[in-house]
Amino acid sequence: MLAAASNDGSLEKVAFPARLNQVLCIYSADGYGSSSLFNPLPSIAEDNFTILGERVESAQLGGLRTRKSGTSVATVIAAGVAALILELGFQRPTKVQEMDLRSYAGIRAMFVAMSREEGTFTTDGRHFIRPWMLLDVNKDLDYVLMHMSYILERL
């Protein structure tokens, strides 16, 4: 499960259910990976992931567009990334164990893999998810699936 951290800033703690174990806590970042000012302080848990959540273009009724910000916006984007990971795993289930991917540990491992390169931590120690670190369009699909399998084998 993924859950938004909160938009109450550093004066408040991470909201429920994002502060629970086995829940991926999602914070907001700007387009450069800097943690949003409205994020709460990182929790003691390891799952302090950030992803784009500021000034994201959103559709409204009547065809209007507006920009939205928040950890809930970031959580929707993180859920979309998780869905792409699951879809990749389902395309070739012999290469990637579906059951491992459909778990907290599986998605967490993929998010960690997307945020472990040098420079992907925000200044306050959150993990900035960069989907292109794993889902590289310049790599063959078999290579990406092999990399995903390798990550899951290390769980």
Indicate residue ranges for each PLM-predicted region.
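Extracellular S/T/G-rich loop segment that most often corresponds to the catalytic His/Ser-adjacent loop
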Residues: 4, 13-90
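Short acidic loop-to-helix transition motifs that present clustered carboxylates
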Residues: 8-10
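C-terminal subdomain of the subtilisin-like protease fold in secreted/lumenal serine endopeptidases
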Residues: 87-155
